[in-house]
C-alpha cells in the first residue's frame, strides 16, 4: 500500500470521527452548550490547535496544545456529547498524556470539565482512571499554571478536578 493510500485512510478516519455522534452534538446544542472542539476553538488562537490522539475516538475528551495570545498552552475538554463526558481509562490516558507534556515543558494547562462522572461500565478501572488524572494534576500544582473551568454538571469525582 502506498503512503498516499495510507494518508487517505487516516484522513477518512479523521473525518468519520468528526462526523459521528450527531445525536450527542444535537443534544449539546439543544441545551445551549458548545461542543468540546467549539470550546477549544473559542479559547485558542485561530489555527493553533494540534490535537493529540484524535484517532482514539469514543474517549469523550479532546486534548492537545495551542496558543492563547501567542503563548503556548495545553488544553483538554471533556466531551459531554460522548457518553455524557463520563471518565474512563481511554479518556484518562489522553488527559494524562497532555499533563505529562505540560510538566516536561513547563507549559500552562487549561481544563474544560463537563462530565457526569465515571464510566460505570468500566467498574474499578474508571475510578483508577480518575486517580491517575488526580495524581498528575496534583504533581503539577505549583509547577505549572492550571486553570480549570466547570462547564457542565461535573458530578462525583469529576467535581474534584476543579479543586486540583
Annotate each predicted stretch with a short phrase.
Residues 1-147, 153, 158-160, 164:
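Terminal-region recognition feature
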Amino acid at each position: 500500500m502506498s503512503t498516499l493510500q495510507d494518508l487517505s485512510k487516516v484522513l477518512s478516519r479523521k473525518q468519520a470521527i468528526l462526523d459521528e455522534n450527531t445525536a450527542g452534538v444535537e443534544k449539546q446544542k439543544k441545551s445551549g452548550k458548545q461542543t468540546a472542539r467549539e470550546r477549544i476553538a473559542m479559547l485558542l488562537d485561530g489555527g493553533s490547535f494540534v490535537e493529540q490522539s484524535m484517532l482514539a475516538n469514543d474517549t469523550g475528551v479532546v486534548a492537545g496544545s495551542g496558543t492563547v495570545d501567542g503563548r503556548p498552552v495545553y488544553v483538554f475538554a471533556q466531551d459531554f456529547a460522548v457518553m455524557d463526558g463520563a471518565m474512563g481509562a481511554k479518556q484518562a490516558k489522553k488527559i494524562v498524556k497532555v499533563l505529562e507534556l505540560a510538566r516536561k515543558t513547563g507549559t500552562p494547562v487549561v481544563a474544560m470539565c463537563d462530565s457526569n462522572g465515571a464510566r460505570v461500565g468500566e467498574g474499578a478501572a474508571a475510578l483508577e482512571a480518575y486517580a491517575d488524572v488526580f495524581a498528575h494534576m496534583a504533581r503539577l500544582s505549583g509547577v505549572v499554571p492550571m486553570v480549570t473551568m466547570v462547564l457542565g454538571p461535573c458530578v462525583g469525582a469529576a467535581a474534584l478536578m476543579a479543586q486540583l
